[in-house]
């Protein structure tokens, strides 16, 4: 292997690929900070919950191309409460395979989410998490809900609940 040192790369200014620098078939461009790949999805139907145990809301797979990549996880939870009870408390959880990377495993405390109104309500909760999985094997990311202390039950609406995963080069 040799090293090619240049000051400027310039694409042709005319033709079918005018002003484009092309990477040959079967090769990849690796530039820190760029998005290598994106996958996204949503549950096919509404997902109901009614207990204090962890409820799987949605899973999505990605296979990183580089073990140095970071995965930016973007999630939206469209939560509807079936509540006429005094409280509904819980936590929004993200797992990488079986490892908890966001949220809480225990059932104590008030949780991330708390509603004490005793009314039926809809909430839209969005957040992101930057993960460093250090692998090129397939990863399964899981969105979940875990009730804490009280749970009156509810559902995650398929039209407002989704997840996107972006592999970011380092």
Task: Set out the residue ranges of the language-model regions.
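Glycine-rich, low-complexity segments
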Residues: 3-47, 170
């Amino acid at each position: 292997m040799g090293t090619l040192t240049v000051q400027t790369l310039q694409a042709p200014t005319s033709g079918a690929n005018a002003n484009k620098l092309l990477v040959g078939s079967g090769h990849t461009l690796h530039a820190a900070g760029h998005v290598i790949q994106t996958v996204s999805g949503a549950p096919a139907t509404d997902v109901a919950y009614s207990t204090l145990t962890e409820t799987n809301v949605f899973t999505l797979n990605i296979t990183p191309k580089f073990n140095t990549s970071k995965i930016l996880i973007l999630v939206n939870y469209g939560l509807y409460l079936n509540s006429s009870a005094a409280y509904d408390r819980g936590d929004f959880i993200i797992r990488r395979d079986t490892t908890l990377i966001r949220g809480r495993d225990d059932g104590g405390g008030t949780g991330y989410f708390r509603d004490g109104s005793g009314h039926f309500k809809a909430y839209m909760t969005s957040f992101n998490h930057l993960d460093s999985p250090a692998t090129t094997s397939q990863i399964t990311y899981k969105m979940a809900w875990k009730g804490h202390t009280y749970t009156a039950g509810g559902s995650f609406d398929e039209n407002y609940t989704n997840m996107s995963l972006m592999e970011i080069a380092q």
